From Swiss-Prot:
Function: Regulatory protein; part of the gene cluster that mediates the biosynthesis of sesquiterpenyl epoxy-cyclohexenoids (SECs) such as anthrobotrisins and arthrosporols, metabolites that possess a novel hybrid carbon skeleton consisting of a polyketide-derived epoxycyclohexenol combined with a terpenoid-derived monocyclic sesquiterpenol substructure (PKS-PTS hybrid). The SEC pathway plays an important role for fungal soil colonization via decreasing fungal nematode-capturing ability.
Compositional bias annotation for Low complexity: 27-40
Induction profile: Expression is down-regulated by the HOG1-MAPK pathway downstream transcription factor MSN2.
Superkingdom classification of source: Eukaryota
Coiled-coil regions listed: none
Stated name of the protein: Transcription regulator AOL_s00215g275
Biased composition (Basic residues): 88-106
Effect of deleting the gene: Displays significantly decreased fungal growth on nutrient-rich media, while no significant difference in fungal growth was observed on nutrient-deficient medium. Displays also distinct fungal colonies with different morphology with much less dense and thick aerial mycelia. Leads to a 204.4% increase in conidial formation and a 7.6% increased germination rate. Shows slightly decreased trap formationand exhibits significantly decreased nematicidal activity.
Composition bias type Polar residues, residue spans: 14-26, 47-60
Region of interest called Disordered, as start-end residue ranges on this chain: 13-65, 84-108
Amino acid sequence: MFTSLRFLCFGNTPLPSLNSSRSPQRTPSLGSSSTSSLSPIEEELATPSTPESNDSGLTLSSSIGPYPIPSSLMREVESIRSHILQQKSRHQNQPSRRHKQKNRRQRLQEVAIKQSIASSIREKAKPIATPTCYYDVSSPYAEDTSVFELNPAGEKNTNEEEEFGIASQHDWDEMINPHYNYLGAQEQIWDGDLDSSAYWGLDDLISQGYFETYDNSSVVCHPKQDANTDESYSISKALTISRNVKQPNGDTGWWLVKHVDPRALSKLGSDCVIL
């Protein structure tokens, strides 16, 4: 009864006999390893294998117990291991989400400060009044190109005597049309004594964007040569440009001028000084 219970609990491996002094010695001694009765599989299992190690904490072994791993499987495992290492390194090098949000807030604050400064500068540089007429000498109507200014009533300031026979007021639609030019070459612009040669070549400067009404300074040009080939501009005269001039009759006009560029003025053969 005891024997059958012994086989039931431990399988086919019998327990050592009580009289073990008469059973053969299965454990090899230290000096007789060559006479060991262990099978090759048992020796392989008993011998600890030394796996290949790396700094990442992942280990690779070329065999599982006594069975070698195929080279194709080893290459696949190595590929997976390299991919894991790359992902781990990339994750460590990337800044955290909180750090990204902090940098983004800083950039937005810098942009907001710059925009507020730029807005303040633009507000200070904004002219008191916007020119009420537009001008484009590149239009097919711009055969005779002159500069004109408007008074607050929307009327073009001309010589009261109209010695050139030009009307003092034109159709408003024509005034605000940027592709229309109706002025004569010698048309008087200022009233009274302030109409001296204001029609000299300023149209060329305006058409190329060289003036802007943004401050109270005046630009005085002493032409060395004619800015136009038209005979009506053949007389060389001084030209004074001012942003806001009060006429003798009380009218206040605005020049349609843009940005001052000394290089552009020199190309036109003029010596200009910003006063």
